[in-house]
Structure formats: C-alpha cells, structure tokens
C-alpha cells in the first residue's frame, strides 16, 4: 500500500488505504 516502505507491505495488501 501507500505505507509499503514503513509497514513492509510491499504488495500493498495490508496498507492499501487511500491508494
């Protein structure tokens, strides 16, 4: 998601909010 660099969510699955 948008926070991939911070959360380690490189696929954007966990932090897709607002993306």
From Swiss-Prot:
GO terms for biological process: killing of cells of another organism. Expressed by the venom gland. The keyword Secreted applies. It is found in: Secreted. GO terms for cellular component: extracellular region. Keywords: Cytolysis, Secreted. The keyword Secreted applies. Presents weak hemolytic activity at physiological concentrations (micromolar range), and weak lactate dehydrogenase (LDH) release from mast cells. Does not induce mast cell degranulation, and antimicrobial effects. In vivo, injection into mice induces very weak or no change in nociceptive sensibility, and very reduced or no edema formation. It also reduces mice locomotion, suggesting an increase in anxiety, but causes no alteration in rearing (standing on hind limbs). This is Cryptide Pep-2. It comes from Tityus obscurus (Amazonian scorpion).
């Amino acid at each position: 998601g948008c926070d991939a660099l911070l959360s380690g969510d490189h696929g954007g699955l966990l932090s897709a909010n607002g993306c």
